[in-house]
Amino acid sequence: MAKKSKIAKNEQRKVVVERYAAKRAELKKALVDPNGTDESREAARLGLQKLPRDASPIRVRNRDAVDGRPRGNLSKFGISRVRFRDMAHRGELPGITKSSW
């Protein structure tokens, strides 16, 4: 079980990323625009730097939806490998069977 403060901080980051997503996308588009001038690119770069650090989506950590475990996350299911194994053994994941050959 992850610390509740770490889980809360990650949720707060998700909110910040969502809040600045449109502005960030606009600045990134201006940064790589082939028709843009050097001044507009410089302005876009400075604008991007002025955004909060947590506005970058790379700062959001994928965590287990049940207990918040940060490592070994299976993104298709949204849970960690440990939780996945337990749930699969108990038959709580429909369509998941243990391999045997």
UniProtKB/Swiss-Prot annotation:
A GO-annotated cellular component: small ribosomal subunit
GO BP of this protein: translation
Gene Ontology molecular functions: rRNA binding; structural constituent of ribosome
SUPFAM superfamilies reported in the protein's UniProt record: Glucocorticoid receptor-like (DNA-binding domain) (SSF57716)
UniProt keyword list: Ribonucleoprotein, Ribosomal protein, RNA-binding, rRNA-binding
Keyword Nucleotide-binding tagged: no
InterPro entries (alphabetical): Ribosomal_uS14, Ribosomal_uS14_bac/plastid
Domain of life: Bacteria
Family membership: Belongs to the universal ribosomal protein uS14 family.
Protein role: Binds 16S rRNA, required for the assembly of 30S particles and may also be responsible for determining the conformation of the 16S rRNA at the A site.
Alphabetical list of NCBIfam families matching this protein: PRK08881.1
HAMAP family per the UniProt record, alphabetical: Ribosomal_uS14_1 (MF_00537)
Name of this protein: Small ribosomal subunit protein uS14
